[in-house]
């Protein structure tokens, strides 16, 4: 059975983009693959969270993983920092990662532009840590979005470089994988691209948002004065809202409002109300489970403990073998 590895940074609550773009696929994958789904708390340290926020965010993602349908009996769910072997492999891979290639990372350059006062080594070596996350379980399939494909390519580079250096074929090549044929891209509500935790207030709809919060966010979403010509191209902000409707609403509902737009007869108030209600309906089962699971501290501790044991079984085997390949031996 092939191994799948993926994770989500513990930087806050999960939103519709996380669910439809990743976690929904995780739930399907767990039935057919050997899956490791982790909470990436090491990665979140680049933004310097407080200890309280770090722990709270890890707990929140764990709750929401479970509420969304990831089953700890089928998949290994674990917290990244509970598997110290990842940090050790990260160290070894760093010894063969070079400044030039790390500085060419598109993600690194974007972060430098956005936060020039926080250009830390963790940001620079982010792709190396991602490679360690993947290679520690010798994964061959990695569900990633378009923005992570370069990092996955670098993971292959680091694994192949290790193999060449030590004249082995130890690490397999990991490749991008999505359970469905088409990668779902979930736009935000601010009219400027994808939904994300760091994209500003009002951009994201969270799985835990109460109905009234969702209604307010959607009604405030960026729109315009409406179409002035029949069948005109939708501007980005409006196209984003229609893309959201395509994800959460029925095909008939989408076609109805698309037809109204093309006839210059759409009322954005009615359109947004429908979109909000469909978002509320689509997230209701998860929201109810979040509230239920969040109260069960014993269950959460047990899931995290069980996941750490399973993940370390795989990771410790890899590290033992990597040490031998490198030449670390006890006297």
Predicted feature descriptions by range:
Residues 62, 69, 97-100, 139, ...:
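A generic secondary-structure signal for well-formed alpha-helical elements
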Residues 11, 139, 200-202:
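Short, solvent-exposed beta-strand edge segments and adjacent coil->beta transition regions
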Residues 2-132, 291:
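N-terminal Rossmann-like or analogous alpha/beta NTP/dinucleotide-binding catalytic cores
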Residues 110-162, 166, 187:
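Internal, conserved structured core segments that host functional sites
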Residues 99-103, 136-143, 249-257, 287:
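Short helix-capping/linker segments at secondary-structure and domain boundaries
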Residues 18, 150, 156-331:
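Conserved nucleotide- and phosphate/pyrophosphate-binding catalytic cores
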